[in-house]
Amino acid sequence: MPDLNKIIEDLSSLTVVEAAELSKQLEEKWGVTAMAAAAPAAAAGGAAEEAKDDFTIMLISAGDKKINVIKEVRAATSLGLKEAKDLVEGAPKEVKSGVNKKDAEEIKAKLEAAGAKVELK
């Protein structure tokens, strides 16, 4: 089996024109087209919206219990006390992005229990 790192290096050094030519030749050799793979994804666009993987947790407002919200923001992120306080006081702000659905819902529930108004996007 060829050295995969060498193949990766070789592919990384290709220009855009060379990469397009490589793609074209591979399509011919393997008897496939790049468009065929993209068509099912486009048709399932509505379903992809519902099955969203990454969520952004937005703090809309801190509510009356700002200290509790700051504590939960610190627990959900790696922010220090001052950064978490600034985030909470500057609402609406993004608390965390790229979070899976389960974790996003857990963080949202904790922030809401602390008194915050939160949205998932």
UniProtKB/Swiss-Prot annotation:
Domain of life the protein comes from: Bacteria
Pfam families named among the record's database cross-references: Ribosomal_L12, Ribosomal_L12_N
Keywords: Ribonucleoprotein, Ribosomal protein
KW Ribonucleoprotein (keyword) present: yes
UniProt keyword annotation of Nucleus present: no
GO molecular function: mRNA binding; structural constituent of ribosome
Swiss-Prot/TrEMBL GO biological process terms: translation
One GO location term (cellular component): cytosolic large ribosomal subunit
Homology family: Belongs to the bacterial ribosomal protein bL12 family.
HAMAP family listed in its UniProt record: Ribosomal_bL12
Quaternary data: Homodimer. Part of the ribosomal stalk of the 50S ribosomal subunit. Forms a multimeric L10(L12)X complex, where L10 forms an elongated spine to which 2 to 4 L12 dimers bind in a sequential fashion. Binds GTP-bound translation factors.
Role noted for this protein: Forms part of the ribosomal stalk which helps the ribosome interact with GTP-bound translation factors. Is thus essential for accurate translation.
Listed name of the protein: Large ribosomal subunit protein bL12
Annotated gene: rplL
